[in-house]
From Swiss-Prot:
Any single biological process term in GO: photosynthesis
Species, as recorded: Phaeodactylum tricornutum (strain CCAP 1055/1)
GO cellular component, one term: chloroplast thylakoid membrane
Pfam families in alphabetical order: Ycf4
Subcellular location: Plastid, Chloroplast thylakoid membrane
UniProt-recorded name of the protein: Photosystem I assembly protein Ycf4
Lineage: Eukaryota, Sar, Stramenopiles, Ochrophyta, Bacillariophyta
The protein's role, per its UniProt record: Seems to be required for the assembly of the photosystem I complex.
Membrane topology: Multi-pass membrane protein
């Protein structure tokens, strides 16, 4: 029974890089916002520098704008971390002849995203590797109606050998062919 069902966990937004950027943007945003407020009230709110000498218009105003923008992005990133957006699992069930792709979305009607496909509708397991400025290395579920469903999460590119090994194992498990996209 255990050999007939395979479940791969997907890490969502709770990755080190998201924690790093949320913290970095929060601290930077607070610094910029406090610098702008300091220039307006002529009171030094930052202990490590004197920002009271900044002219409020335009420097202080721009600093406040960038600070507020940075704080907004950091709060959004923190919310995606708290809600664990994008996490879930892929389940491959040879007993029921199904592939289930389950992910967490944003709160609301579609908080839990469930995609179910019959193995009879699956044509192959596909690998897509693109190099360059924004490299991607992904495994796809290729359906007979020409749709490609991504199975790997958005992340830093993994080693090509690891990706190929994972795709090969999955193709062998599902008794499907492997193709390059």
């Amino acid at each position: 029974m255990q050999n007939e069902i395979r479940q791969d966990k997907i890490i969502g937004s709770r990755r080190f890089s998201n924690y790093f950027w949320a913290f970095f943007l929060l601290v930077g945003g607070l610094g910029f916002l406090l610098a702008g407020i300091s220039s307006y009230f002529k009171v030094n709110l930052l202990p490590f520098t004197n920002t009271t000498e900044l002219v409020f218009i335009p420097q202080g105003l721009v600093m406040m704008f960038y600070g507020a923008l940075s704080l907004g992005i950091s709060i959004y990133t923190l919310l995606t971390i708290i809600l664990d957006i994008g996490s879930g699992y892929n389940e491959y069930n040879r007993i029921e002849n199904l592939v289930k792709v389950v992910r967490k979305g944003f709160p609301g009607k579609n908080r839990e995203i469930l995609l179910t496909y019959s193995l009879s509708n699956v044509r192959a397991i596909g690998i897509k590797i693109t190099e360059g400025l924004n490299p991607t290395r992904s495994i796809y579920l290729c359906l007979k109606d020409e749709r490609n469903i991504p199975l790997t999460p958005v992340q830093e590119p993994t080693a090509i050998s690891n990706l190929e090994e994972e795709a090969t194992d999955l193709a062998k498990f599902l008794d499907l062919r492997l193709e390059n996209l």
